[in-house]
């Protein structure tokens, strides 16, 4: 298809329009030099502040990770020190304080949630059930929601609040197949037993067995089914 013919008059007119438009822009900048300069400075300041904030957050995150590593070392030492209960308790206390320090430095994102989970683990090891539950609750909406729900279930179970424990175990029991689903089902079954609801406990153990036929818990599950059937 042939292109549209452009007249000589149009060719002569277009440079004039460009020059006129350019002139208007130049005049605007000249007449509004101070506001334009001010707006430019503001934009640069905002960009610089954003870059500095990003750099600072990255530095905070790195510092928190370093503290986390120290805390994890203490936590592992405490977990392996069951032969000396007093020393173990002291180590869990130190680990908890380190994780709290890491969270204070950087409490956002995955790094912050890892700190919270381990703060909860330390409280749990120290039998500080309410504090453990509170820490785990901070992670129910994040990437570690399955860990948090299961851990809250254990916390309420340790307190003897089986209805609340069952509610949190149920989150994982209703989830996708995997380790947390099996743990969730086992937790639900234990809670039904504790609440003297044996038919529901039996049904849950049977469900766990059906969903995880190759689990290393098969012998235990078969025994529980046999026991509850009487």
Language-model-detected regions and their locations in the chain:
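Short solvent-exposed coil/turn linkers within tandem alpha-helical repeat scaffolds
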Residues: 102-112, 126, 139-147, 174-181, ...
